[in-house]
Structure formats: structure tokens, C-alpha cells
Amino acid sequence: MGKYFGTDGVRGEANVELTPELAFKLGRFGGYVLSQHETDVPRVFVARDTRISGQMLEAALIAGLLSVGIHVYKLGVLATPGVAHLVKTEKASAGVMISASHNPAQDNGIKFFAGDGFKLDDALEAEIEALLDAEEDTLPRPSAQGLGDVVEYPEGLRKYQQFLVSTGTDLDGMKVALDTANGAAATSARQIFVDLGADLTVMAEKPDGLNINEGVGSTHPEKLQELVKETGSQIGLAFDGDSDRLIAVDENGVLVDGDRIMYIVGKYLADRGLLAKNTIVTTVMSNLGFHKALDREGIEKAVTAVGDRYVVEEMRKEGYNVGGEQSGHVILMDYNTTGDGQLTAVQLTKIMKETGKKLSELAAEVTIYPQKLVNIRVENSMKDKAMEVPAIAAIIEKMEAEMAGNGRILVRPSGTEPLLRVMAEAPTDAEVDYYVDTIADVVRAEIGS
């Protein structure tokens, strides 16, 4: 991560941290860096989610792009994975998404995609950051025919919808409930499932600029759980603000998280010989029950640090085609280059239809172990050295010995705060409490601040 770019682009409170001035510079300097790697005049797709600050940042960003001769195609409100898909299939130079994903409305972000549909690599982000930190803007200032222009491109939305529909199957007779989080999926999800023939109920589909993710969506699925039960739906599908995540709800109103979704999709592909290298890529936060279910099926797993960026890196490096996170980022590399909530939803309903199984039946193959996570404030200088403290290392070893393989402990530092995260999984809540509390007490005594 750099000074401005985190693991998912540049983020901050809109008009306070992520200002129009910064958006202009990101457009100008980002556009210039991209143009240095192009032989033709660059063509960049720009989209946003439904936040009230989106249009302000979009205008500033586009002005910056135009100032260095970039041709801009405005996609309007579109899901983040829609930008990635269109950049790759329409052979654009790059794409930019204005969104803060599952964050509240006051936040926003700017994320770049390269021409291959993947997020910019660290080297290109470093070039942009160097220009942002330069004392003077010495970039060329073209005029007249050297400036870029803007093309409204609303057909991009329909092309993305048609692509998603093409990956699915006829859902005639299936009752589906959608929660579009008052976000980007509000422009696309309904039509996708109408085209597939589902019997639909849709909630959180009226964005007003301020209600994105507010008590709805993948991070707040409680209302969808009730809606599924009230309507007798066979599945509920909850997206986040930019629709790169999916959390599902079974016909009984029970949540089906990213771990279970990855398992369902991965097993479906493995049974048909279509799971690349018979492996699913996941992070250290995936539940022990997920790991045990994969072991039972003979499916391999590759484990990365937390963050879909690291999952994608591992998938690209090794040629895997399924990966994701417990939070609902699921990457299906046969179809798209990034997590895509609506794509995952289409695949999940297809699997239900083709197997003839209820979602509860498919999900029941993964027994989710109770999990507890405690954040402990520690001295910042010690958070990366906790495992070097003899008492901490000893208590973790003791707890793991007591688990005897029927549980899991993960102790890791926060990437952004002076915190040590202590997580445990075990067959019962009482056991989880015991393991986490015992370790946490020792951590506080040894390095707590």
C-alpha cells in the first residue's frame, strides 16, 4: 500500500479527505501515467455508485482525464465488476470506479482498472503517487485538438446485464428476493433476474444518494432475511454498495456467507472437472468448517492474507478460477477479473436449478464453527512482534494443543490501527470464549497499551 492508494484504491470521507481537488489530480496524473503505456490515444471508462458525492467526484476526475487528452466514456451508475468487464471486453485503455463499496454514504473512493480488467499494479500506482507528491505539476497542457472528449455510454449497462444473463440458466418458477443496498445493483439486478425468468421481489432499490448500505445490503441482511420468509422465496441475494460482494439467504431465512458460497460453486465445478487445479483460493479468515468440508471432498485450498486483492494475485499467479472471502467477495475468473456479486448470484441460482437442491441443502455441507474475534489495543511498535513474546507464544501453543485439531486460532496485527486481532473457532461458543479470552488476557498483560 502507498501513501494514497490502499488495497482498494483511494478512499476517504468525500469532500473532506477525498476532495474534488484530489479527484482532479487523480484523473490528470492517472491519465498521464496510463497514456505513457499506450500507443493510441487512451480511452477510459468511468462509472460510479449512487452516493451523493459521486457526481461531484466524477466531474472532477473526468476534468483531470480530459486535461491530458484522455477520451472518457461515461457509464453512469454501474457495479464495480461491470467496469472491469467492459474495460476488458471493449478493449479500453483503463477504467475508473468511484465508490466506497460497503462503506457509509459519507465516504467515497476512486479505483483504477488496467486494460486487462485487473486493478492497477503497485508500480503504476507508485508512478501516480510520485506525481501527486511532486512540488510542481509539470505535465503537458494540450489545447484544442489535444484535449480529450466525453462520450455518454449508457449501453455499457445493458451489455453488462446481457453478459451476466448469458452465464445463467432459465429460472422460471424460482422465487427470488433481491436486496440491492440502494447501490449500484439498483440499476441492473432486477433486469438480470427478469431476463432469467425468476419470480422477483426486490427491496432497497430506491437510492437517494444518502441511503446506500444504510441498514441494508450484504453487511445488513436482516431485512432480507425477513423478506425471504414473508414472501416464501427460495433464495435471497444481498449485494453491497458497488455490487462486488454477495451474501445469500436460504429459504428458511438463514444466512449463507462467502465461505459457503465458495464451497457450493467450487464443488459444483469440481464435480464436473471444471475447478482449475482442483483448488479454491481463500483467506486466513475462512471458517474451519469450510476447510474441513473441502478436505472431505478432496478439494485443495490456497490461503492468502485478508483482502480480495491478495486472493486475485494468487489466482492469477497459479491459474486458479475460484476464490474469495468470507465477507462475500467471490472471484470467478472464468467470467470476470474481480469479485462480482451479481455474477455470483446468477451462478448460485443456476446451481440450485440444475441440481434441484434447496440452498439450505447445498449450504448444509459446510458446518460453520462458532467464531469469535477480539481486538486488543497494543503498543504500535509491538503489534508485529507479538509472536516473539514468550508468554504469548506459549499460551497460543497451549490452546492449540488443547484443541487437538478440532479448532483454530489466528492472531494477527491490524494493518491500519495499533490493534492485535485474536480469533478462535471451535465446536461450541463456550470453547471459543475460553480460547479467545485466555489468549487475550495474556496479550493485554504483556503488551497491552
UniProtKB/Swiss-Prot annotation:
Details of cofactor binding: Binds 1 Mg(2+) ion per subunit.
Pfam families referenced in this protein's UniProt entry, alphabetically: PGM_PMM_I, PGM_PMM_II, PGM_PMM_III, PGM_PMM_IV
Protein name, UniProt field: Phosphoglucosamine mutase
Residue spans crossing the bilayer: none
One of the record's GO cellular component terms: cytosol
Family from the record: Belongs to the phosphohexose mutase family.
PROSITE patterns membership: PGM_PMM
Annotated positions of the Phosphoserine modification: S101
Example of a GO MF term: magnesium ion binding
